[in-house]
Each structure stands twice: as C-alpha cells, then as structure tokens.
C-alpha cells in the first residue's frame, strides 16, 4: 500500500466515514491514478478536471460520478490540503447559520 493511500485511509477513519464509503473513495482515487498512470499527488487541478469531464462525457451514472468526485475531493482537500476551485468553495457553516438567524 502506498503511503498516500495509507494516509487517506487514516484521514477517512478520523473523519468517521463508513467502511463502504472509504472503499468507494479509494476506488475513485485508484481509477484516477490508473487513467494517468501517475500518483494522484503529482496531478494538476486541470488534469483532474479533464478526468472528471471525461467521465461526464462518457455518460457515467450520476451517482457513480458524484461519489467518485467526492472521493477525489476528500483526497485533495483533506489528505493533500489542496483547496482547489474545482471542488467548490468550503462553506463556513457557522457563518451561514448565523447569517440565516
């Protein structure tokens, strides 16, 4: 097991993600790495964007696409600490709740 995969599994465990979710997220990362034949930590935001666009264009089921996207978002945001625009902005839940009150 690669150090990156081990770290992601640890991060998902700390985040309290279910075993099934962890497996799906790891599978999404594995598919991305296989597509480019490189470690995901070596990929640019544009490369990940093109990969996701290709999934959409091939007609991957919406649920499959979204869970894969969430898995990649977890990897890049939580494990690698990259806050890419590709995955949208993080919302400050407290500020949102206070603004709604």
Regions found by a protein language model. Give the residues of each.
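Intrinsically disordered, low-complexity and often Lys/Arg-enriched segments
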Residues: 1-2
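N-terminal core-binding DNA-recognition domain of tyrosine recombinases/integrases
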Residues: 6-98
């Amino acid at each position: 097991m690669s150090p990156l995969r081990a770290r992601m599994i640890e991060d998902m465990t700390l985040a309290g993600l279910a075993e099934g979710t962890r497996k799906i997220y790891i599978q999404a990362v594995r598919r991305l790495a296989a597509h480019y034949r490189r470690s995901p930590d070596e990929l640019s935001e544009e490369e990940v964007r093109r990969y996701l666009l290709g999934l959409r264009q091939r007609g991957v089921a919406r649920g499959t696409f979204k869970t894969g996207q969430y898995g990649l978002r977890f990897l890049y945001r939580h494990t690698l600490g990259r806050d890419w625009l590709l995955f949208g902005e993080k919302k400050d839940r407290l500020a949102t709740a206070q603004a709604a009150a």
